A protein has these predicted regions:
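N-terminal active-site beta-alpha-beta segment that forms phosphate/nucleotide-binding
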Residues: 1-113
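Conserved phosphate- and dinucleotide-binding cores of soluble alpha/beta proteins
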Residues: 90-172
Length: 172
């Protein structure tokens, strides 16, 4: 992602002589421009994310679903929507238990930590009606790759006709 971002900003620092101060200034300015661009993208994605969340939703996620997902939930909460997020523990590193669930609790969002194998049960019993994740990689055709368990949950969502929204900054 960083290489792609730097390329998109047209950064080529090869074979040009710079003094140390100039390089620091260039890098500082570049980082600032990238931060502004990412903030804009996250804000736009979270506008979409909050718009698809409806009152009383049960939302399933996987792993740590990016800033745009958290912003989506925060915006939906600020709009007065009530919902609950079901967070699988995400083994083997427990990103759901260690990152996502505590972040949601800190934001004051109703959260339930569940085992990785519960997604199908939650969908079949209409406890969850929306699936939202990040995407670790996005192909040019729009297909995504994400953490282990995402495919199984996506297949369950398709079977139970539950919308699946994957958040990503851009194709890889």
């Amino acid at each position: 992602t960083m290489a792609r971002t730097l390329t998109s900003f047209g950064v080529k620092l090869t074979a040009i002589e710079f003094d140390k101060r100039t390089i620091v200034e260039i890098v500082d300015n570049l980082v600032h421009m990238i931060e502004i661009d990412f903030d804009r993208r996250y804000d736009l994605m979270s506008d979409f994310g909050s718009s698809v969340i409806t009152d009383q939703d049960g939302i399933l996620t996987t792993c740590f679903a990016e800033h745009s997902f958290l912003l989506s939930l925060l915006k939906a909460k600020d709009q007065g929507k009530r919902f609950k997020v079901f967070v699988p523990e995400t083994r083997p590193y427990l990103q759901g238990a260690r990152l996502t669930a505590p972040s949601l609790v800190e934001l004051g969002i109703e959260t339930a930590l569940v085992t990785d194998g519960m997604a199908g049960h939650l969908m079949a019993n209409k406890i969850v009606n929306r699936y939202m994740t990040a995407a670790d990689a996005v192909a040019m055709d729009g297909s995504i790759a994400n953490k282990i368990g995402t495919l199984t949950n996506a297949v369950c969502a398709l079977h139970f006709q539950i919308p699946y929204h994957a958040f990503a900054v851009s194709p890889d």
